[in-house]
Regions:
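Class I SAM-dependent transferase core
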Residues: 1-87, 102-106, 111-113
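Conserved nucleotide-cofactor-binding alpha/beta core module
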Residues: 59, 63-180
Length: 180
């Protein structure tokens, strides 16, 4: 109803991927289009899986194709990576980066049987991971960021782009950034 197209492919993977596999918290709010927690960090910060309408918006805007390489910065419990992995197929690859070791551990445990999903802990969003391969087809940043770091913008492929909520914490806009 909100105007975002839900393709048959997106609908199928969302129906077939049980949210309960990615969170030990009550998942009922998710079915009412609300975000749900999936873990709490050592510092007491609650990490969430986005509401379904936001996940659909992100997936729609990613323009995913089979065999793509997709980088997701911000784990969202592994749920988003599972959806993306299904949409890009077994010849694609999903690389999940997160700055929180607890979040990476949680997501890895939930996705042990997914051979096309890799995980890596980031020192900081500002610092490129060591020995990180090539140019980027698709980059999805799931948490707000004021501006894209150079290690990302300089490696967007000719046909690639980044989807990210850019701007200050209280005033972000979901943006699509292509190679300049």
């Amino acid at each position: 109803e909100g105007g975002i197209e839900v393709t048959n492919e997106i609908k199928k993977v969302m129906i077939e991927t049980e949210i309960e596999l990615f969170s030990d918290y009550d998942c009922d709010p998710f079915y009412s289009d609300r975000p749900i927690p999936f873990t709490e960090t050592e510092l007491g910060e609650v990490k969430t899986i986005s509401a379904p309408h936001m996940i659909i918006t992100l997936l729609h805007n990613m323009e995913l194709l089979e065999e793509q390489e997709v980088i997701i910065i911000g784990s969202k419990g592994g749920y988003l990576a599972a959806l993306v992995a299904q949409l890009i197929g077994e010849k694609g690859i999903v690389r999940v980066l997160d700055t929180c070791a607890n979040v990476i551990s949680h997501s890895k445990q939930r996705l042990t049987h997914w051979p096309t999903i890799e995980f890596r802990e980031l020192e900081s969003i500002e610092v490129s991971p060591v020995a990180f391969p090539g140019e980027f087809d698709r980059v999805l940043i799931t948490g707000h960021i004021e501006e894209l770091p150079n290690w990302i913008t300089s490696r967007i492929s000719d046909t690639g782009f980044v989807i990210a909520p850019l701007g200050p914490e209280n005033n972000q806009h979901l943006m699509k950034i292509e190679r300049q």
